């Protein structure tokens, strides 16, 4: 392979000159350079400046690099290990294990991280619902197996907690293979997640890839492709249904913005890179389901300053089948998960996909919550006394629905001291239908807070000294 030398180092950007009488490395090729400490660094070609000079982005710290050092072209893009050997392990952007475990053997298959998206005739469309066990998601914004889901929210509203709960529930209940990709997030969260998964026994079915906050922008920009390449292999070669978790897709955009500025490109709206839509499209179009297998992707999307019109979350919206919007005002009310039931959407909330009963219950829940939102202005000015009896009933049921949409998470047990709950879709529909039909009007609203299925509400109310009058609710007490 061709050899060149470093002519300039500016932070993570390294300019390399190759002889003009030889073929230059292609864009996206990986180059190798050994620094004074004997460590091998990987650079990725991003621009051709002319006269044999290529501009590259380093995947690691450029400390110790200097002009004149020899650089070798590997002749191919960055390649990462794929297949069963990746399960239960933690990798960096280059596919090197970072969990302190043994090195992978030389016979482990590797694939390049840059690929074309599947062709149209290879794609498959599925209408099967993926049960998550989280009531608010399963009822109002059901996830499609093989679809793309975005978890939108500002700082500290619970995006990572929901992702961790989804990994737990899906691994325990469905036993599928997961790939978790940590893009530019806190190293502590990745560490906690690793040990939680190890303790719960789901690590053996999960591959983890991290490029966290402390990494150079090149690594944070490419680590999403590393995780995706591992997931694609399970889909295309093993023919499996894979879950791909990305936390956080905004950091992918943010790293792209840093790289763009370092490369000297003119910034676009709000300082983002001019290639924002292209970069997002190249990643998202590869996350899809084919006739061989599926990738169901769940992506956390940080919303800067809670502004949904920011180009980063707005560009991501276009690629998603379902959105779960997390709202700060619900956090302030102590409702967890803080999912906004009126703003969250799903293309699968259709009677032909979820069934007539599920659809009708979901629509009625949304209608009651919408009416409650409209009545809140009157309540805040004139008080509850000015409402009609029907309106008072709507407010009471809406508050019960709002509280019943909350539940305890398994992954939060160590913080709350309360056991988590997994609620099947059938139980979720039954519970909300009973509230809508007025069968639980005599129960106090506090009984609906942070519980699992509707049986838990009835038992909690009894502990509070209230026995339900409805025969169906009474039967639940007798059944215990």
UniProtKB/Swiss-Prot annotation:
Keywords: ATP synthesis, ATP-binding, Cell membrane, CF(1), Hydrogen ion transport, Ion transport, Membrane, Nucleotide-binding, Translocase, Transport. It catalyses: ATP + H2O + 4 H(+)(in) = ADP + phosphate + 5 H(+)(out). This is ATP synthase subunit beta. F-type ATPases have 2 components, CF(1) - the catalytic core - and CF(0) - the membrane proton channel. CF(1) has five subunits: alpha(3), beta(3), gamma(1), delta(1), epsilon(1). CF(0) has three main subunits: a(1), b(2) and c(9-12). The alpha and beta chains form an alternating ring which encloses part of the gamma chain. CF(1) is attached to CF(0) by a central stalk formed by the gamma and epsilon chains, while a peripheral stalk is formed by the delta and b chains. It is an enzyme of class 7 (translocase). GO terms for molecular function: ATP binding; ATP hydrolysis activity; proton-transporting ATP synthase activity, rotational mechanism. Pfam families: ATP-synt_ab, ATP-synt_ab_N, ATP-synt_VA_C. NCBIfam families: atpD (TIGR01039). ATP binds at residues 153-160. Its EC number is 7.1.2.2. Belongs to the ATPase alpha/beta chains family. Its main location: membrane. It is found in: Cell membrane. GO terms for cellular component: plasma membrane; proton-transporting ATP synthase complex. Produces ATP from ADP in the presence of a proton gradient across the membrane. The catalytic sites are hosted primarily by the beta subunits.
């Amino acid at each position: 392979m061709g050899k060149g030398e470093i002519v300039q180092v500016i932070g993570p950007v390294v300019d390399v000159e190759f002889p003009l009488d030889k073929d230059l490395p292609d864009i996206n090729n990986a180059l190798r350079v050994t620094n004074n400490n004997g460590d091998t660094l990987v650079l990725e070609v991003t621009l051709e400046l002319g006269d044999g000079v290529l501009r590259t982005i380093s995947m690691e710290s450029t400390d110790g690099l200097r002009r004149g050092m020899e650089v070798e072209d590997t002749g191919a893009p960055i390649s990462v290990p794929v297949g069963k050997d990746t399960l239960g392990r933690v990798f960096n952007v280059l596919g090197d294990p970072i969990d302190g475990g043994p090195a992978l053997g030389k016979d482990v298959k590797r694939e390049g991280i840059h690929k074309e998206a599947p062709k149209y005739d290879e794609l498959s469309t599925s209408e099967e619902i993926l049960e998550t066990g989280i009531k608010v998601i399963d009822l109002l914004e059901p996830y499609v197996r093989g679809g793309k889901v975005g978890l939108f929210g500002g700082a500290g509203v619970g995006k990572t907690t929901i992702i961790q709960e989804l990994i737990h529930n899906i691994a325990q209940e469905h036993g599928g293979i997961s790939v978790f990709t940590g893009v530019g997030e806190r190293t502590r969260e990745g560490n906690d997640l690793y040990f939680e998964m190890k303790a719960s026994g789901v690590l053996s079915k999960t591959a983890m890839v991290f490029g966290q906050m402390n990494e150079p922008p090149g690594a944070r920009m490419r680590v999403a492709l590393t995780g995706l390449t591992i997931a694609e292999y399970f889909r295309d070669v093993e023919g499996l249904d894979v879950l791909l978790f990305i936390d956080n897709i905004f950091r992918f955009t943010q790293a792209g913005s840093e790289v763009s500025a370092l490369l000297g490109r003119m910034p676009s709206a709000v300082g983002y890179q001019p290639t924002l839509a292209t970069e997002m499209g190249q990643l998202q179009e590869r996350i899809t389901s084919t006739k061989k297998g599926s990738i169901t992707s769940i992506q956390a999307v940080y919303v800067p300053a809670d502004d949904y019109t920011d180009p980063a979350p707005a560009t991501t919206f276009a690629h998603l089948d379902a959105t779960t919007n997390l709202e700060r005002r619900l956090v302030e009310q102590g409702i967890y998960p803080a999912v906004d039931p009126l703003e969250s959407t799903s293309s699968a909330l259709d009677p032909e996909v979820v069934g007539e009963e599920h659809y009708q219950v979901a629509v009625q829940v949304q209608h009651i919550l919408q009416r409650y939102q409209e009545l809140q202005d009157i309540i805040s000015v004139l008080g509850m006394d000015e409402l009609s009896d029907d309106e008072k009933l709507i407010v009471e049921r809406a508050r019960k629905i709002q509280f019943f949409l909350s539940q305890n998470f398994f992954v939060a047990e160590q913080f709350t001291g309360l056991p988590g709950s997994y609620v099947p879709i059938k139980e979720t529909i039954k519970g909300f239908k009973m509230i809508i039909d007025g069968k639980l009007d005599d129960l106090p609203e506090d009984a609906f807070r942070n519980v699992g299925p509707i049986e838990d509400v009835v038992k909690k109310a009894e502990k509070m000294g209230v026995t339900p009058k409805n025969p169906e609710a009474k039967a639940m007490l007798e059944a215990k």
